[in-house]
C-alpha cells in the first residue's frame, strides 16, 4: 500500500531546520510567544503577542544565545568581528550570543551596544558600551523583534559614525511579518533602505506551519479558529 502524500504544511515543516522547531517550542515554553486576544501599543488587536522580556533565567538566556548563534551562523557565517545590540534589550542579546558563538564554534567576537545617554567620564566615556568600533570592523546587529524600522533608523547612524564599519546584516528572533511604511514587510524595507540583509531565527509563517494543530506545552496553540484569526489579522 502506498504511503499517503504529506500535506503542504508537513512538507514545509520537514524542510525546517531542527533548531527552528526547537526555538518555536522554546518561545511558547518560556511564555514569550502567546496566542489569544491582545492589544498592541498601536491600538491594533492581535491574536498573538511576543514579549522577549520574559526570558529571565540563566538557562533561558543560555538557550536563547545558542539559537541566535545558530541562525547567525546559517545566514551570515562567522566571518565578522562585532555583535551590536541596540539598547536596551539588545545589550543582553549581544552578550549571550557572543558567549554562545564561542561555546558552539570556538570563535571570538566582541559585543557592543549604545547608551541612551553618552557617558562623560571614566575610561569608557562616550556613547558606546562594551567594545569600541573601529575602521574595518564587520558588524552583525542583533535585536529581539522588529515590527517597524524605527529601531534601525536610530541604530544605523550610531554605527556609521564610528568610522569605516561594514554592517553584514541584522538578526532578530521573530519576524512578525508586519508591513512597514508601505506594502512590504519591515525587514524587507530595512534591506532596501540600508543595503544589508535582515533575517530572523524564525518567521510567523514558520510558527504557523509548525504549531498548526500540533500539541505544544499540553495544548494545541494554533487550532483552526486561531489560524483563521491570524489569517484575518494579516489580511487587514
Q: What residue spans do the PLM features occupy?
A:
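Short, Lys/Arg-enriched N-terminal segments with co-localized hydrophobic residues
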Residues: 1-15
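Active-site-facing substrate-recognition patch
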Residues: 14-78
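PRPP-dependent phosphoribosyltransferase catalytic core
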Residues: 15-25, 157, 161-236
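Short glycine-rich phosphate-binding loop at a beta-alpha junction
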Residues: 79-87
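Gly/Ser/Thr-rich loops at beta-strand to alpha-helix junctions
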Residues: 87-93, 148
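Short, glycine/charge-rich flexible loops or terminal/linker lids adjacent to PRPP-binding catalytic cores
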Residues: 95-139, 153, 221
Amino acid at each position: 500500500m502506498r504511503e499517503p502524500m504529506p500535506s503542504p504544511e508537513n512538507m514545509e515543516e520537514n524542510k525546517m531546520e531542527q533548531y527552528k522547531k526547537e526555538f518555536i517550542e522554546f518561545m511558547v515554553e518560556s511564555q514569550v510567544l502567546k496566542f489569544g486576544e491582545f492589544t498592541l501599543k498601536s491600538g491594533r488587536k492581535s491574536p498573538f503577542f511576543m514579549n522577549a522580556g520574559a526570558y529571565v533565567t540563566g538557562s533561558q538566556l543560555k538557550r536563547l544565545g545558542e539559537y541566535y548563534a545558530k541562525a547567525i551562523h546559517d545566514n551570515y557565517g562567522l566571518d565578522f568581528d562585532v555583535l551590536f545590540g541596540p539598547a536596551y534589550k539588545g545589550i543582553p542579546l549581544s552578550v549571550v550570543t557572543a558567549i554562545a558563538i564561542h561555546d558552539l564554534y570556538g570563535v571570538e567576537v566582541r559585543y557592543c551596544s549604545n547608551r541612551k545617554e553618552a557617558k562623560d567620564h571614566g575610561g569608557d566615556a562616550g556613547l558606546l558600551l562594551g567594545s569600541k568600533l573601529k575602521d574595518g570592523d564587520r558588524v552583525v546587529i542583533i535585536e529581539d523583534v522588529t515590527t517597524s524600522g524605527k529601531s534601525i533608523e536610530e541604530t544605523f547612524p550610531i554605527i556609521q559614525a564610528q568610522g569605516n564599519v561594514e554592517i553584514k546584516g541584522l538578526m532578530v528572533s521573530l519576524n512578525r511579518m508586519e508591513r512597514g511604511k508601505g506594502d512590504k514587510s519591515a525587514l524587507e524595507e530595512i534591506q532596501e533602505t540600508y543595503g544589508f540583509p535582515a533575517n530572523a531565527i524564525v518567521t510567523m509563517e514558520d510558527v504557523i506551519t509548525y504549531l498548526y494543530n500540533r500539541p505544544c506545552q499540553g495544548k494545541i496553540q494554533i487550532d483552526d479558529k486561531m489560524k483563521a484569526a491570524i489569517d484575518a489579522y494579516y489580511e487587514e
